[in-house]
């Protein structure tokens, strides 16, 4: 007797690493129920599109992905941030099977079950203990909370994902332990506001191994650092207690890397942005951090052309960049997002000026990046291998997060493996990347 074919689902995941984790959770549940993943839409029984709705450009990309799925398959379920305000999606594609907002895993699964029932009851042994991951096997995103309590004027994330909801520390650590046991070498800690972790739980303790651990940024980072993997902290707001984790970096417990979205430097612009810690003595803190941990790498993002940003404000930002010597920078031209309070601010900046300022900032940052990378020539760096080539392999140092930072290009006299961590001698640097060879051979 022929066995019925397992139902197949194609999946599109758009947006940030937090959304990628949402996709991984949905896929893990589907695989546990016997669904198979199809590589192409036309080879699937239905398609799920996890959308991004933060910027208009992201919404355009999401609508395009939905359109491609409809054209290739016709049976489409939409979820994610753009689904929180479904009117635009419904107007463009009225025949979708379902539209849900972010984190609504059960609603997505219910929609799948209605359109494409599973063949049999769930068998949890169909999936590995660490769940299904969409990243390469050697690194994984570890989401520690949902939502955000901040009300930055340019952002609608709290409207889409709600207020901060932290996971108990023990739960996070158990997931991290499973990932490391499955071969993950690098844990990328993500959330909307990583350093606010545990505020909503009042830093409550939860059991982990033979002890209790508080749901607190420092405590969690310290415990993660004991698992034997690289631990990279991302989306960290510069609250005062962030100073505490610098010591962990100096001790080698977590990677000497902080991803802090400063967004601007001008006090007036920060005030209009309603950014936390807007009046902080940030330059003095950065100097102190580097005194404690000289190997510290700082990554940040900035918005140029925010309403009311003057030539003086922008000059202040460029000067601040020179003094701060931020290692890695991403910059965005301000874009009005429907529902953001910054849309109502006076003195909107023209697109032409935004482009001029973006080009000027990136040119300045390129010089800063090249200067800082040049200091690493002649040093030895640990590098995790992402891609193996016939003559040159590509990896990342402790200073490089996947997808967003630079790379280290290496030659080696012996074969390398993806996920392997090697010691490399740095021989050359350019504006964003390092070049060298595997040491000791």
Swiss-Prot record:
Ranges for domain TRAM: 374-440
Segments traversing the membrane: none
GO cellular component: cytosol
Binding site for [4Fe-4S] cluster 1: 16, 52, 81
Annotated positions binding [4Fe-4S] cluster 2: 148, 152, 155
Signal sequence region: none
Cofactor(s) the protein needs: [4Fe-4S] cluster
SMART domains named in the record: Elp3
Cell location: Cytoplasm
Domain Radical SAM core: 134-371
Molecular function terms from GO: 4 iron, 4 sulfur cluster binding; aspartic acid methylthiotransferase activity; metal ion binding; protein methylthiotransferase activity
Cofactor note as given: Binds 2 [4Fe-4S] clusters. One cluster is coordinated with 3 cysteines and an exchangeable S-adenosyl-L-methionine.
CDD domains reported for this sequence: Radical_SAM
Enzyme class: transferase
Xref: SUPFAM superfamilies: Radical SAM enzymes
Record flagged with keyword Cytoplasm: yes
Any one of the GO BP annotations: tRNA modification
Keywords, sorted A to Z: 4Fe-4S, Cytoplasm, Iron, Iron-sulfur, Metal-binding, S-adenosyl-L-methionine, Transferase
Gene3D superfamilies the record matches: Methylthiotransferase, N-terminal domain (3.40.50.12160), Nucleic acid-binding proteins (2.40.50.140), tm_1862 like domain (3.80.30.20)
NCBIfam families: 30S ribosomal protein S12 methylthiotransferase RimO, MiaB/RimO family radical SAM methylthiotransferase
Family recorded in the similarity comment: Belongs to the methylthiotransferase family. RimO subfamily.
Protein role: Catalyzes the methylthiolation of an aspartic acid residue of ribosomal protein uS12.
Name of this protein: Ribosomal protein uS12 methylthiotransferase RimO
Protein species of origin: Rhodopseudomonas palustris (strain BisB18)
């Amino acid at each position: 007797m022929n066995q019925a074919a397992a139902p197949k689902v194609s999946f599109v995941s758009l947006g940030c690493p937090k959304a990628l984790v949402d996709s991984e959770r949905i896929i893990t549940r589907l695989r546990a129920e016997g669904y198979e993943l199809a590589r192409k839409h036309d080879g699937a029984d239905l398609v799920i599109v996890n959308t991004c709705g933060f910027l208009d450009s992201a919404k355009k990309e999401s609508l395009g992905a939905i359109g491609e799925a409809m054209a290739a398959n016709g049976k489409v379920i939409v979820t994610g941030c753009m689904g929180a305000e479904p009117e635009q999606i419904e107007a463009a594609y009225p025949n979708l099977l379902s539209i849900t907002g972010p984190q609504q895993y059960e609603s997505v699964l219910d929609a799948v079950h209605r359109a494409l029932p599973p063949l049999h009851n769930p068998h949890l042994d169909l999936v590995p203990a660490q769940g299904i991951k969409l990243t390469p096997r050697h690194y994984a995103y570890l989401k520690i909370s949902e939502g955000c309590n901040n009300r930055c004027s340019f952002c609608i994330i709290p409207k889409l994902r709600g207020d901060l909801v932290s996971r108990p520390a023990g739960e996070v650590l158990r997931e991290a332990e499973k990932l490391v046991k499955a071969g993950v070498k690098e844990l990328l800690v993500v959330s909307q506001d990583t350093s606010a972790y545990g505020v909503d739980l009042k830093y409550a303790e939860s059991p982990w191994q033979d002890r209790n651990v508080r749901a607190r940024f420092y405590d969690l980072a310290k415990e993660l650092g004991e698992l034997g993997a690289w631990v990279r902290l991302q989306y960290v707001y510069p609250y005062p207690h962030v100073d505490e984790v610098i010591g962990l970096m100096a001790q080698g417990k977590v990677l000497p890397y902080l991803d802090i979205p400063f967004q601007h430097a001008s006090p007036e612009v920060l005030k209009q942005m309603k950014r936390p810690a807007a009046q902080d003595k940030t330059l003095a803190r950065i100097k102190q951090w580097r005194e404690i941990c000289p190997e510290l790498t700082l990554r940040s993002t900035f918005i140029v052309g925010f309403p009311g940003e003057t030539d003086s404000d922008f000059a202040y930002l460029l000067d601040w960049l020179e003094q701060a010597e931020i290692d890695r920078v991403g910059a965005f031209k301000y874009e009005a997002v429907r529902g953001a309070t910054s849309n109502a601010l006076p003195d909107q900046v023209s697109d032409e000026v935004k482009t001029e300022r973006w080009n000027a900032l990136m040119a300045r940052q390129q010089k800063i990046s090249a200067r800082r990378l040049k200091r690493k020539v002649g040093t030895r760096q640990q590098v995790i291998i992402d891609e193996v080539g016939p003559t040159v392999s590509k990896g990342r140092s402790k200073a490089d997060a996947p997808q967003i930072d630079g790379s280290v290009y290496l030659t080696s006299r012996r074969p390398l493996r993806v996920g392997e961590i090697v010691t490399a001698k740095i021989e050359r640097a350019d504006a964003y990347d390092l070049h060298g060879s595997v040491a000791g051979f």
